[in-house]
Amino acid sequence: MLKVAASVVVKDGKILAARRKAERIGGGYWEFPGGKVEANETPKQACQREVLEELGDEAEILERLKVKRHYQTPYGSLEIDFFWTRLKTFNLKHVAASEYRWLTKEELWDVDWLEASKPAVSLIAQTNLEKYDE
């Protein structure tokens, strides 16, 4: 089973969405910054590392979103943890994504999300973001 951790970054009442590069599996779809949990690493640690690698930013990882964690994909089993995240720096390098967008809760469904991200998007749309904002 592939273990993945993703950061739901909140700033100024908006959520950071990342569009997967066309050549990657799921290319063109939107997701939250994140990636594989490495051996001897917790999902929270993976989020911090992935935010630094993908965005060039340091992050404060907050609590885990209480959403579905296990998915069966055409490529195998996936376990994903989503975490509310605050950025400590704001470089936003385009390393893993072809594009980034800051979306309001009302705009969340204006982009095509990866299937595994949709339960998190549904929860975010119903959440008061002030608790996780700066």
Predicted regions and their residues:
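The catalytic Nudix box helix
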Residues: F32-L65, T104
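Nudix hydrolase/Nudix homology domain
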Residues: G27-Y29, F82, K93-E134
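Short histidine/acidic/glycine/proline-rich micro-motifs that form metal-
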Residues: V37-E38, H70-Y71, E107-W109
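Short coil/turn segments
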Residues: R20-A22, W113
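Conserved N-terminal beta-strand and adjoining loop/helix that marks the start
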Residues: M1-L16, K36
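Active-site-adjacent beta-strand/loop module that shapes the phosphate/pyrophosphate-binding cleft
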Residues: E58-A59, K68-L92, E99-R101, K105
